[in-house]
């Protein structure tokens, strides 16, 4: 049975400022760096063999810190990027106009093909993160990969594995540097395919991360 660990990046400057990041970027805070170190300490006991990361700066830095602890190389995969939030990226949440808030709500409330102008839909996000996860099945037998990605992207992945719609990710609390695990099983008696073992574990962190509204 293949076990895949899923880690959200550490806290960033824009997380702390309540800015919409999407595929734009901001650096990890000192707290975010510490969170990544704590994931690294935990990961050393998990037998991680591969680290696969989104190619955005905040995930790259998180992956580098974890890789240093695990002694693993990093592969970057753009399919693990965060949802493209279009024209709302870099904006503070509290600064959105009524029209802009309407775009955001369409996206997160499951409106068919809802998207922010110049952004992508939750369905498009779901397709690419599932493709990235499926690539793990091509790794050598006995591999135990760790994927570093983003809040909405990982929430969408876990939700859809559970058979929920992509926009149900808002019902999952995946804090900065939380660890989730999904397993691929083949069984005559149990559900074959991907199953969720754990979601949003933060027991390795000193203190809870920000309860962000935006990732």
From Swiss-Prot:
<dbReference type="GO" id="GO:0004619">
    <property type="term" value="F:phosphoglycerate mutase activity"/>
</dbReference>
<feature type="site" description="Transition state stabilizer">
    <location>
        <position position="150"/>
    </location>
</feature>
<dbReference type="InterPro" id="IPR050275">
    <property type="entry name" value="PGM_Phosphatase"/>
</dbReference>
<feature type="binding site">
    <location>
        <position position="60"/>
    </location>
    <ligand>
        <name>substrate</name>
    </ligand>
</feature>
<feature type="binding site">
    <location>
        <begin position="8"/>
        <end position="15"/>
    </location>
    <ligand>
        <name>substrate</name>
    </ligand>
</feature>
<dbReference type="GO" id="GO:0006096">
    <property type="term" value="P:glycolytic process"/>
</dbReference>
<comment type="pathway">
    <text>Carbohydrate degradation; glycolysis; pyruvate from D-glyceraldehyde 3-phosphate: step 3/5.</text>
</comment>
<dbReference type="GO" id="GO:0005737">
    <property type="term" value="C:cytoplasm"/>
</dbReference>
<feature type="active site" description="Proton donor/acceptor">
    <location>
        <position position="82"/>
    </location>
</feature>
<dbReference type="InterPro" id="IPR029033">
    <property type="entry name" value="His_PPase_superfam"/>
</dbReference>
<dbReference type="InterPro" id="IPR013078">
    <property type="entry name" value="His_Pase_superF_clade-1"/>
</dbReference>
<keyword id="KW-0324">Glycolysis</keyword>
<keyword id="KW-0413">Isomerase</keyword>
<feature type="binding site">
    <location>
        <begin position="82"/>
        <end position="85"/>
    </location>
    <ligand>
        <name>substrate</name>
    </ligand>
</feature>
<dbReference type="InterPro" id="IPR023086">
    <property type="entry name" value="Phosphoglycerate_mutase_GpmB"/>
</dbReference>
<dbReference type="Pfam" id="PF00300">
    <property type="entry name" value="His_Phos_1"/>
</dbReference>
<dbReference type="GO" id="GO:0016791">
    <property type="term" value="F:phosphatase activity"/>
</dbReference>
<protein>
    <recommendedName>
        <fullName>Probable phosphoglycerate mutase GpmB</fullName>
        <ecNumber>5.4.2.-</ecNumber>
    </recommendedName>
</protein>
<dbReference type="InterPro" id="IPR001345">
    <property type="entry name" value="PG/BPGM_mutase_AS"/>
</dbReference>
<feature type="binding site">
    <location>
        <begin position="104"/>
        <end position="105"/>
    </location>
    <ligand>
        <name>substrate</name>
    </ligand>
</feature>
<feature type="binding site">
    <location>
        <position position="58"/>
    </location>
    <ligand>
        <name>substrate</name>
    </ligand>
</feature>
<feature type="binding site">
    <location>
        <begin position="151"/>
        <end position="152"/>
    </location>
    <ligand>
        <name>substrate</name>
    </ligand>
</feature>
<feature type="binding site">
    <location>
        <begin position="21"/>
        <end position="22"/>
    </location>
    <ligand>
        <name>substrate</name>
    </ligand>
</feature>
<feature type="active site" description="Tele-phosphohistidine intermediate">
    <location>
        <position position="9"/>
    </location>
</feature>
<comment type="similarity">
    <text>Belongs to the phosphoglycerate mutase family. GpmB subfamily.</text>
</comment>
């Amino acid at each position: 049975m293949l076990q895949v660990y899923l880690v959200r990046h550490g806290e960033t400057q824009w997380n702390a400022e309540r800015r919409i990041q999407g595929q734009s970027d901001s650096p990890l805070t000192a707290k975010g760096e510490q969170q990544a170190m704590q994931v690294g300490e935990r990961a050393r006991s998990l037998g991680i063999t591969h680290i696969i990361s989104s190619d955005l700066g905040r995930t790259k830095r998180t992956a580098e810190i974890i890789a240093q602890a695990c002694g693993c190389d990093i592969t970057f995969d753009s399919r693990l990027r965060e949802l493209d939030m279009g024209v709302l990226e870099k904006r503070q949440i509290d600064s959105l106009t009524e029209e802009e808030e309407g775009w955001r709500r369409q996206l997160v409330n499951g409106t068919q093909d809802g998207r922010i102008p110049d952004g992508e839909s939750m369905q498009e996000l779901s397709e690419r993160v599932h493709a990235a996860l499926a690539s793990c099945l091509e790794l050598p037998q006995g591999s135990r990969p760790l994927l570093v990605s983003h809040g909405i992207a990982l929430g969408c992945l876990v939700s859809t594995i559970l058979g929920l719609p992509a926009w149900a990710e808002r019902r999952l609390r995946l804090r900065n540097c939380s660890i989730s695990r999904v397993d691929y099983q083949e069984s005559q008696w149990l559900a074959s395919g991907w199953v969720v073992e754990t979601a949003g574990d933060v027991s390795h962190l000193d203190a809870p991360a920000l309860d962000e509204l935006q990732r």
